[in-house]
């Protein structure tokens, strides 16, 4: 009788364990912040097609990747800063997230820093990655933000072969600065090596020693 009871208990335990296990095709809930992709002068949201596809292949959810289209294509901070602020607020509301991460190309880097420095973005962003960013037009240092518990982490990626934005504008004091070679300004948007550094930056691999 004891053997029969023990066998029954073992069988019941196995059944319950199978029922409790998630389906083999189920994916774990994304732990990433929503990502806002910020284009530069004369750019558009489609500039980030390759980067979006790469991030999706690395586990980011497609519905958490947002690419802004600025009305003002000249990169004017006074116009693009407020639009970016409103856009981030909408993303936070839609996703329920507390913060976003930003990947910005060219003048989009300056627009992002302007938003952080002057328009309340300092407590709404966790990680910033700039690609050939014209960062120095707003700040030459990695702005810490306004969250007392967590500085904004920065990764600034730029190329010695960039003929549009000089490297000295892209470098941010206190950030993780990565100088590459053989990649043009537009090429930063579709380069596999750059993609790897973007992933690291979005996963908290940036720096802020300020």
From Swiss-Prot:
Keyword RNA-binding recorded: no
InterPro entries documented for this protein: AB_hydrolase_fold, Lipase_EstA/Esterase_EstB
Catalytic activity: a triacylglycerol + H2O = a diacylglycerol + a fatty acid + H(+)
Compartment(s): Secreted
Signal peptide location: 1-28
Keywords of this entry: Hydrolase, Lipid degradation, Lipid metabolism, Secreted, Signal
Family indicated by similarity: Belongs to the AB hydrolase superfamily.
Protein name, entry field: Extracellular esterase EstB
Organism, as annotated: Bacillus subtilis (strain 168)
